[in-house]
Amino acid sequence: AAECGEQRSVALGAAGMDGDVPFSPGWADWTQEEREHEARRLYEQAGYSPERPLRTEIRFNTSENHKKMALAVASMWKQQLGVVTTLVNEEFRVFMQNREQRTVTEVFRAGWISDYNDPYSFLEMFRTGHGRNDFGYSNSTFDALLDQIGTERVRARRERLMFEAERMLMSDHVIIPVYTYVTKRLVSPQLKGWQNNVMDHHPTRHMYKLKLRAAAAPKAAEAPPPAEPSVPADEERQQ
């Protein structure tokens, strides 16, 4: 993912969205060694060990990038914890069917591109019974927060409510954020009216193209006019 410019993510929302109050879990500031130590402690606390490893699977729809990501995750889990992971690659239609029907309850890949410039677009998917809630997440306190966000008109209070909702979601460990998508655009310097934005919306009615003038060719140096022929003094007197 890093090869394509994607940005590392430790929470749900996309940075830069209107009304976003960035949430960062406490471990985000830990060193890699501290994270690995805590992961091993929690792994053992859950009853797993090298002799009794966790066995799980990661499902992903067909894509070379998704495959690379799944391989990397499985490798790190194996190296640090001893987790035995089976990778399952499925055609998109089958993958979505298994995900939506929750016939499989192991780890699966998921991604979302917001419909509008508001963090609520990400949060609402986790409401109990929501059509996009393939995770099966259900938390009445979280649902109540979403209700408050939907009716709150004071911007600062609404932002705080969204922050609390994201904090709750991350505390419940519903998802493991990996990276945030980015868009890559090559824009001509002649194109004006283009404005980079988090939604990647670019109405052409606001754009225009400058016509660059061709550089004028340098003029040839003008030679001075020929000098008048000199007349001898004797001839000048005779004239």
List where the protein language model places each region.
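Short, solvent-exposed loop/beta-turn-alpha elements that line the ligand-binding surface or hinge
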Residues: 17-37, 48-51, 98-103, 124-151, ...
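Structural transition elements
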Residues: 2-45, 63-68
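Extracytoplasmic/periplasmic, Sec-exported soluble proteins
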Residues: 5, 27-35, 61-69, 87, ...
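Extracytoplasmic/secreted proteins, especially bacterial periplasmic and envelope-associated proteins
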Residues: 34, 38-41, 65-72, 76, ...
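Periplasmic binding protein-like
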Residues: 76-127
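Bilobed periplasmic-binding protein-like "clamshell/Venus-flytrap" ligand-binding domains
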Residues: 45-62, 108-111, 153-189
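Sec-exported extracytoplasmic/periplasmic mature domains
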Residues: 1-6, 44-49, 75-83, 100, ...
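Solvent-exposed loop/turn segments at secondary-structure junctions
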Residues: 4-8, 17, 62-66, 92-94, ...
